[in-house]
Each structure stands twice: as C-alpha cells, then as structure tokens.
C-alpha cells in the first residue's frame, strides 16, 4: 500500500495543485487530508470546491472548528477571512468532517493529537521557543497503546513541520508538514515561530514494505508568487513573506526568546 498524507493547505490552491500533481506521479493508492484546509487570505472558495470534488478521506483541524463558530467578529484574521467567504455547501462539508479517523487497521489520523486539535504532537513549546518533542512527550500525547491509539501509524498535522518519530513501542508518528504555508508565528502557549526555510509545498508519502513503513517527507516546488501577491492584496504581508521565503518576518523572529527549530526538507 502507498499512502499520501497532506495537511494544512490553508487555502493555497496553487500549492495544492502542485502537491496533487506530484502525488499522481508516485502511484499512491490513497490520499488523506489532515485538516486546516481553508483559513488564510488566499483561495477559499476554489480550494473548497477542488477538495469537495476529490472526496478524499478528510478530518477537520482546529481552523475548521474555529471558522464555523457563530461570531465572526471574535475570530482571528485567517478564520474570519475564510468564514466570510464560505458558501452553505462548504459549511455543510466542513461541519460533517470528523475530528479523527481510523483509516485502516494500521493507520489513525488526527490533526493535533488524538485528543486535542490544538496540541503539538511532535514539537513542544516553552518559554525558550519551540523544539522537537522528546520521546517521552510524544508517547504521552499518543497515549497508552493498550488503552488509547493502538494503530501502528499515527498521522498528524497542525505544526506545519514535517517529521517522523518512532515510539519505543514501535508506533510511528508522521507529520507531513504543510501544503500551503511554510512559516508562521504564534503566542500560545509561549511566543514561538515555525519556519521550514523554503517555500516548497510539503506532504508525506508512506509505503508499506515487508520490513515496515517507508516514509518520504517530500518538498514540492511551485510558483508561490501569485499566492504571496494575493496575501499582500488581502492585507497580510506576514503571509506574503512566509509564502515567498519559508521564514517569518524579522519582527516575529525577535518575539521568540530563542531561535526556533528550522526544518529543511
């Protein structure tokens, strides 16, 4: 079996097209979408229509939950931009998405962790910024294999950082990274930035071999300039810079007490 995992598209239709084209060359049997699909200053309607037509196995992320809340005025800028443009059929589609998905007997999908769409699975944030999670931290988030998620492979998203980690009990946790946005800053639970260092669209390709699962964290080139220009037109120069470079602007970098982890695919 060969599986493509995509996540965190954030309305970047051009990056999505590039990733889907690359997936088509790999012979993947199935593609799964791990959420955070539309929120951002880009192509909301067009991305929704493209994905609804594909009918991929899909879960919701925190941004789907947030963008469907009733009070648009209380939303962050990215969710509000999406919420104002969602058509009724888009809302119905997003509302029907599950928070987690058992894709096969071996494969389990979540956005953040199995129990929380806002928690980073393979990274941790403290007063010093963001760092890779320890094995103990990741294992705690996965839960006891006997009582919680016992599947051999757990797919997650949310952080935009492509990474794979095998737990001591043999379970494999894979984050494919983000299709649509390669850098951002956040202040929860502490100020930190995430930077992948290039504008490439990310996804993961998993292939079942006799010895276990082979994981490829793929970085796909695409022309990010139209997305950057659109973000700029919609009043988001921070997104424009991140889309062009894979880095946050210097003012956001200065907000993190220690230089964050940079993942380069």
Predicted regions and their residues:
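Redox-cofactor binding/interface segments in oxidoreductases and associated redox assembly factors
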Residues: 33, 156, 175
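Core catalytic region of metal-dependent phosphoesterases/phosphodiesterases
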Residues: 2-95
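Active-site-proximal beta-strand elements of phosphoester/diester hydrolases
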Residues: 1-10, 106-113, 173-177
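Structural motif
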Residues: 30, 57, 153, 171-173
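Generic beta-strand structural signal
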Residues: 33, 102-103, 166, 208
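Active-site environment of divalent metal-dependent phosphoester hydrolases
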Residues: 10-15, 39-42, 64-69, 102, ...
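His/acidic metal-ligating clusters that form di-metal
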Residues: 26-27, 86-165
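Acidic, His/Gly-rich catalytic cores of divalent-metal-dependent hydrolytic chemistry
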Residues: 166-265
């Amino acid at each position: 079996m060969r599986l493509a995992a995509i996540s965190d598209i954030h309305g970047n239709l051009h990056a999505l097209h590039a990733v889907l084209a690359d997936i088509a060359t790999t012979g993947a049997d199935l593609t799964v979408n791990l959420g955070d699909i539309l929120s951002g200053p880009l192509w909301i309607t067009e991305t929704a229509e493209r994905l609804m037509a594909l009918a991929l196995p899909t879960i919701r992320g925190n941004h789907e939950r947030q963008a469907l809340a009733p009070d648009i005025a209380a939303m962050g800028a990215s969710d509000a931009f999406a919420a104002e443009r969602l058509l009724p059929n888009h809302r119905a589609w997003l509302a029907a998405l599950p928070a987690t998905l058992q894709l096969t007997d071996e494969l389990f999908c979540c956005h953040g962790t199995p129990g929380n769409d806002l928690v980073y699975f393979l990274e941790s944030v403290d007063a010093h910024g963001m760092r890779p999670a320890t094995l103990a931290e990741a294992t705690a988030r996965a839960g006891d294999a006997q009582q919680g998620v016992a599947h051999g492979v757990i797919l997650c998203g949310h952080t935009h950082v492509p990474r794979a980690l095998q737990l001591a009990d043999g379970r494999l946790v894979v984050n494919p990274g983000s299709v649509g946005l390669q850098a951002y800053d956040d202040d929860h639970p502490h100020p930190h930035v995430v930077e992948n260092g290039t504008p490439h669209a990310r996804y993961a390709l998993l292939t079942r071999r006799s010895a276990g699962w082979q994981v490829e964290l793929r970085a796909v080139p695409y022309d990010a300039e139209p997305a950057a220009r659109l973000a700029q037109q919609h009043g988001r120069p921070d997104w424009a810079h991140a889309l062009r470079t894979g880095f946050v602007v210097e003012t956001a970098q200065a907000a993190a007490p220690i230089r964050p982890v940079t993942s380069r695919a």
